[in-house]
C-alpha cells in the first residue's frame, strides 16, 4: 500500500485504515506504526497514523487519524447495548468517549459509514 501511494498514485499522504490496527493484536499495531514511519519522505510523502474504528449500527465506522506515532486504538465500552450505543436523545457514550480520546491525542476522524438511517439525524454523532 505504501509503495502504491508513494510511486504509482503519486499521493502526498495515505493512511493504513486497518480495523483497529489488526484487532488489538500487538504485532499488527506495531507493524502499521513501523511501516508508516519507514515510508515517510519529508516534504513529499507523509503517511499518517490511522485506523478504522468500526462499531455496528447505529454508531457506525470512523477513520481516526493522528500526526504522530504511538496512539493505540481505543477499545469499545464493555457492557450493554445502551452503554455502547446510547439513546437518540442522549447520544452514544461510546462515541462521546471516542471524541474525547481524539481531542486528548490531537486526532481527527472521518465518519465514512455512519451506520444510521438518513432520517435518524446522525448529526448528533459529531463533535459540537
Predicted feature locations:
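Extended, charged catalytic domains and RNA/DNA-binding interfaces, predominantly
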Residues: 1-128
Amino acid at each position: 500500500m505504501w509503495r502504491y501511494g508513494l510511486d504509482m498514485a503519486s499521493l502526498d499522504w495515505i493512511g493504513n485504515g486497518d480495523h483497529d490496527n489488526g484487532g488489538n493484536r500487538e504485532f499488527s499495531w506495531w507493524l502499521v506504526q513501523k511501516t508508516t514511519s519507514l515510508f515517510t519522505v519529508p516534504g513529499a510523502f507523509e503517511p499518517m497514523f490511522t485506523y478504522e474504528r468500526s462499531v455496528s449500527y447505529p454508531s457506525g465506522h470512523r477513520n481516526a487519524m493522528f500526526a504522530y506515532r504511538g496512539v493505540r486504538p481505543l477499545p469499545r465500552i464493555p457492557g450493554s447495548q445502551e452503554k455502547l450505543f446510547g439513546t437518540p436523545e442522549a447520544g452514544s457514550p461510546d462515541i462521546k468517549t471516542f471524541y474525547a480520546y481524539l481531542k486528548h491525542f490531537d486526532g481527527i476522524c472521518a465518519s465514512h459509514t455512519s451506520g444510521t438511517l438518513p432520517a435518524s439525524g446522525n448529526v448528533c454523532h459529531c463533535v459540537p
